[in-house]
């Protein structure tokens, strides 16, 4: 343990010598986040929610590849990735202090997550053996997949009431609103819009997937809640987010949209006719009013 601490101190000293202000500020911020996570895991989850797509990203040197996008098979690290690592260490430290806390709460998804993770590890390992996958790039991609499961376990282990769920959901929808506004500002510049603070080569698919996921949550709430004011806010958020969603020109996100809508129809209790009628109207209006760039993206591969 002393050897590990000595190596970490030596590495930090070397980094401070290269970029004292930048690295020093990052270390100080990391220590603050660690303290927040240790004292209150709920507060750290709010930090994580708001950092989603509202934090800068950076390439991992050679891992950034020819392009900073996933399509270029490069690996990019966002600030929330680093926050998640710090949160995990704080979580483990907190569990060591409070021995009554369990490592992972039992949920119906635990076993499927374990099998999926095993499949990712085995597939990447075979790719490394046969030379189809670059070593560090493949490892970092698998780690970023596992990161989502870590978030799931962090949240599930720290949910204790419906009020917490409500507060986390509100924070997520507020983040979606901010992300949508920032993305809409990019539309007049031309090209595909991407998440904020991603530099010259953003990841439109990431933004499209994020808006699709949060839109599904907002749509589900719209169908289940009765308060008029809340329903009006949810409708406004959905109408706002659809504009940058289309501007991402993400085919994968487009393919997911009808699946989400059909799922909402199936899950809706009571009369489903209004949703089916709305779907028909949206298809008719979308065919006529959809921007040509979106039509070309759907109809043509190149």
Language model segments and positions:
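Alpha-helical transmembrane segments of multi-pass inner-membrane proteins
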Residues: 1-16, 30-33, 88, 113-126, ...
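Membrane-helix interface and helix-disruption motif detector
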Residues: 13-24, 70-71, 134
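Outer-membrane beta-barrel domain signature
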Residues: 20-22, 142, 206
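Hydrophobic alpha-helical transmembrane segments
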Residues: 23, 27-29, 85, 89
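N-terminal hydrophobic segments of proteins, predominantly signal-anchor/transmembrane helices
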Residues: 35-141, 146
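Membrane interfacial helix motifs at helix-loop boundaries and amphipathic/re-entrant anchors
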Residues: 130-133, 189-197, 298, 302
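Aromatic-rich transmembrane-lumenal/periplasmic boundary elements in polytopic membrane proteins
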Residues: 147, 292-302
